[in-house]
Each structure stands twice: as structure tokens, then as C-alpha cells.
Amino acid sequence: MSETFSDVEEMSILQSTKKKIGPTADYDAFDHDILVSINSTFATLFDVCGFGGDKPVRINGPEETWDTIITDPRLEWIKDYVFMKVKIAFDPPSNATLLENYNKQITELEWRIYTVLNDYYPDVH
């Protein structure tokens, strides 16, 4: 039995991010660029919110899964945060209003993630 894309989305950080920004799961020409953007986003989350513990989360390919880095359902916003940051870095909207909207959502998500980490994981900071 083969995996459906929704199965991959639930598991793979790279594949679910690719789905959100456009390329299909089997198209891998931009995987390296997308990985760089994902890892940069995790580094930002580490710097801004303390997410990742002692060091930023880093992925190397489609094997890394969301459930290995997000163990608390209150942190599910991290997925949306990664998708939006990668979208802006990889394929930014040409419409200034849309870009501003993305940036406002990103700022709100940073605050929400920081708040959860600060309230429930104070030793992280």
C-alpha cells in the first residue's frame, strides 16, 4: 500500500512544507533550497522563542517528521509559522498587501509560540 500525500503531510516536515508552497511531493529540484529556508526558520524560532532546547531544530531531508519536534499540541502553530516563513523566502507574494498580511500573521504566531514556551516550558529560555 502506498502512502497518500496526506499521510506524508502529517509526517514529513519537508513534504508538507512543499505542499503548502507549491511543488508536488515527487518534484525535488528545489528540495535543497526549501530545506535551507526551513532550517533558517527553525533558527529564527530558536532565537526569538527558544524553540528547540539547547540548539535550533535542523532537518536534512524528507525523513524528519513533525511529531518528532512538536510533542505538545499547543505548539501546532509552528507548522503554520514554518510554512509562511518558507513561502515568503522561497516564493514571496508580489502583492504588497498580501506580503504585509503574511508578516502580521508571522508576528502573531511568534508571539503565540513564545507565550506557550514561556508559560509551559520556562526552563527553555
Model-derived regions: residue spans:
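Short, compact, well-ordered microdomains
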Residues: I13-K20, M84, I88-L117
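Amphipathic protein-protein interaction modules
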Residues: I69-K87
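Alpha-helical protein-protein interaction elements
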Residues: A43, R58, P73, V82, ...
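Conserved short "hinge" loops at termini or chain/domain junctions
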Residues: M1-R74, W111-H125
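Amphipathic alpha-helical core segments of compact helical bundles
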Residues: N39-F46, F83, K87, D91
